[in-house]
Structure formats: C-alpha cells, structure tokens
C-alpha cells in the first residue's frame, strides 16, 4: 500500500509527464490543495484553467466547476478525480428552470432578467443565456446585480435564495421566494429567488454571532454571502472565499475573527495565524462532504488511467449546451 508521500511523488511526476494543469478549489482537502498548481474560488479557477496554455486540465472541485472550464475552453480535455456534485447545483436542472419560468408567468410576471449563480449545471446556464441572462459568482455578484437592475425588469435569481435575498437587501429591494411566497408577493417583488441553498452555509446562525460577540466584544465576523440574510446583515464583512482570505490576512495578529464558511478553509486561515484569535462561526462542523470526496488515491488513479489511454471522469458537454453556457459565462467575465 503506497503512503501519502509515495502518492504525492507519483502525482507530481504524472502531472509533469502529461503536461497537465492541476487546479483545486479552496474547500478541497489540504493534501490536494498542497499539490495544486493553482487554488482559488469558482471565478478564479474558471479563468485560470480556461486561459491556460495546457490542454489537459485536472480539476479538483465539484462537477459544475469542471463544466464551466469545458464550456469556456471546449477544445481542452477536462478530467476530475471525482465527479462530485454540489448539493445546491443539484437543486435545479433545466426541467426545474422551465417549470420556474412557467410559475413566474402564472404569477403575472411577463418579463424578467435571469441571473444564475455559478453553482448550477451547464444546461441551466445555457437556458439562462437563451433568456438573455448571465452567470454570477459570490465575488462579482454585486456588479452583475447592478447590471441586471439597469435592464428595468424583475430579476429572477437562482438557485441560491440566500445570495439573492442578500443582494436585494444590499440594494434596498423587495424579494420573494418562488414556491414559498404567494403569487401576489411574487408579482410585487423586485427580485424573485429560486428556493435553493448551500447546506454548509445554512449551518451559520445569528445565535452564533451573538455567542461570539458576547464572549469577545471586539471580535470581527466574516461570512460568505451564501449565509442567511440575518447572518450576513449582522456580520462585519461578507465576501467570496478569496475575499474572506484577503480580509482575514490583512487583520492584525491580535484581532479576533470568527469566520462563516467551510471548515477546511477556516482551518488553513487558523494555521496562518498560528491558531490564535481565529474561530469558525458554528457550533457544528461546517464541512462540505462533496468538496472533500477527492483523495490522493483518486487523483493518482485518474492521472494514471489517462496516461495509459484509459481516461475516465472526463467532463463532456453537448455542443449547443457548451455554446450557450459559454455566452453566459463570458458575459459575466466582461461585466466583472
């Protein structure tokens, strides 16, 4: 049985032999992040991987991320050690999108501007593009939202209700959730949100903020905008994973901070701050199971198979889906 160090050595050699680019999301296991040529959030990795001069992209993340790279750079080979799926992305597909549009019309909404969070599959992104909409990430969501407001239409934000509600609150707008609020409330809302959510960021509660502020009156709270509105509105800072990292790394060593995002990222930030004055904003383990499925063995096996011409877990998209999804993604990049 090979040791972790043996696997790491073999992975580095295979990446070199295959002339491959290895990218990993911040929420991946530490040993995967350690080997990656680049780490980042969804937007950063999509840009880096699609613009790389490497023809083989090895993506350690969840499936929609690999799809985004494939859509942006259709000619590249994109493989994933695990075809893990984001739970939020699984909450909507092209059928549910069509059904949601039908429900909007039943509520009297004749025109709308769709924004899909990047945590959605390529088919949903393609549908949004066909309806004139765009993709956003947590990093550029405010810019994309401001662009959408200029279209003078009701905004349909999917699939994350929390991010949609937080953007509405940020702009002083009225929001409603499709399937939760009444048809009248849907019709009168400025922003209609699909009823999806992140299972990890739902774990952070206002009570957690109150607990830490009572214990440490000078503590700062930094959270991801996928958290509930009550959490985001009471935090000192809200931003994407990259923005949270930037925020925390600028703090003085003596400044206490509680962070509301996935535990692997928080633990890395703790380590950088010598495990002092850094806390995770939850009494439960804020762990993303699908983001952490990929192991060193998985990475080694997928690379070895590719070298032996037995490739598997390749990300494949239909031509039309890739075309329309790329339009939505490139539009996002142009606007951000």
Curated annotation (Swiss-Prot):
It catalyses: iminosuccinate + dihydroxyacetone phosphate = quinolinate + phosphate + 2 H2O + H(+). One of its GO terms (molecular function) is quinolinate synthetase A activity. Iminosuccinate binds at residues 25, 42, 117-119, 138, 224-226, 241. Binds 1 [4Fe-4S] cluster per subunit. Its EC number is 2.5.1.72. It comes from the Bacteria. GO terms for biological process: 'de novo' NAD biosynthetic process from L-aspartate. The keyword 4Fe-4S applies. Disulfide bonds: none annotated. Keywords: 4Fe-4S, Cytoplasm, Iron, Iron-sulfur, Metal-binding, Pyridine nucleotide biosynthesis, Transferase. [4Fe-4S] cluster binds at residues 86, 198, 288. Transmembrane segments: none annotated. Belongs to the quinolinate synthase family. Type 3 subfamily. This is Quinolinate synthase. It comes from Helicobacter pylori (strain HPAG1). The lineage of its organism: Bacteria, Pseudomonadati, Campylobacterota, Epsilonproteobacteria, Campylobacterales.
């Amino acid at each position: 049985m090979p040791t972790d160090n043996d696997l790491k050595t073999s992975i580095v050699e295979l990446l070199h032999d295959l002339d491959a680019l290895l990218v990993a999301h911040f929420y991946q296991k530490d040993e995967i992040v350690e080997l990656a040529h680049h780490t980042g959030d969804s937007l950063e990795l999509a840009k880096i991987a699609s613009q790389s001069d490497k023809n083989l992209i090895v993506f350690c993340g969840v499936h929609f991320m690999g799809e985004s790279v494939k859509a942006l750079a259709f000619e590249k080979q994109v493989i994933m050690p695990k075809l893990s799926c984001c739970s939020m992305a699984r909450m909507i597909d092209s059928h549910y999108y069509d059904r949601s549009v039908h429900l909007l019309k039943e509520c009297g909404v004749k025109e709308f501007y769709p924004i899909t969070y990047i945590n959605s599959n390529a088919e949903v992104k393609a549908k949004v593009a066909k309806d004139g909409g765009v993709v956003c990430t947590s990093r550029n969501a405010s810019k994309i939202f401001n662009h959408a407001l200029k279209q003078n239409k009701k905004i349909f934000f999917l699939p994350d209700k929390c991010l949609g509600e937080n953007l509405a609150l940020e702009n002083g707008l009225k929001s409603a959730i499709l399937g939760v609020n009444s048809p009248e409330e849907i019709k009168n809302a400025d922003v209609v949100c699909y009823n999806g959510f992140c299972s990890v960021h739902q774990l952070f509660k206002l009570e957690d903020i109150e607990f830490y502020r009572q214990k440490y009156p000078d503590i700062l709270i930094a959270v991801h905008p996928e958290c509930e509105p009550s959490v985001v509105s009471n935090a000192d800072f809200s931003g994407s994973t990259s923005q949270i990292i930037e925020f925390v790394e600028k703090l003085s060593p003596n400044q206490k901070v509680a962070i509301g995002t996935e535990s692997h990222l928080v633990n890395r930030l703790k380590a950088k701050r010598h495990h002092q004055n850094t806390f995770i904003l939850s009494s439960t383990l804020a762990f993303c199971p699908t983001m952490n499925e990929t192991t060193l063995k998985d990475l080694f096996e997928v690379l070895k198979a590719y070298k032996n011409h037995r490739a598997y877990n390749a990300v494949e998209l239909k031509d039309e889906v890739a075309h329309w999804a790329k339009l939505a993604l490139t539009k996002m990049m142009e606007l951000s």
